[in-house]
Design a protein with these regions (language model features):
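Domain-level signature for proteins that mediate thiol-based redox and metal-cofactor handling
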Residues: 1-98
Length: 98
């Protein structure tokens, strides 16, 4: 039996990013509830905000230029754990504002 993927969200406690990390964890658990083994929050310092899936980096605040939108994060996680999965409205293009 293979184990389910595990997500770790490392967030800066000095920057008070716990609520942002918890919200993204909830978004991932809502979307991938049956596909993930665990989503954990790991306190850090020094402005860190990193999301990994089984040690594969999904998002890193400095490298990716800020924080992820939930839609983009879900797409990146999906691309790692189940690339063929349709995310429904999260995979639809957003119309450009005029």
């Amino acid at each position: 039996m293979s184990t389910k993927p595990e997500i770790t969200i490392t967030y800066c406690t000095q920057c008070q990013w716990l609520l942002r990390a918890a919200w993204l964890a909830q978004e991932l658990l809502s979307t991938f509830s049956d596909d993930l083994g665990k989503v954990s929050l790991q306190p850090g310092t020094g402005g860190v905000f990193r999301i990994t899936c089984d040690d594969v980096q999904i998002w890193e605040r400095k490298a990716d230029g800020g924080f992820p939108e939930a839609k983009v994060l879900k797409q990146r996680v999906r691309d790692v754990i189940d690339p063929q999965r349709d995310l429904g409205h999260n995979d639809r293009a957003t119309p450009e504002a005029n």
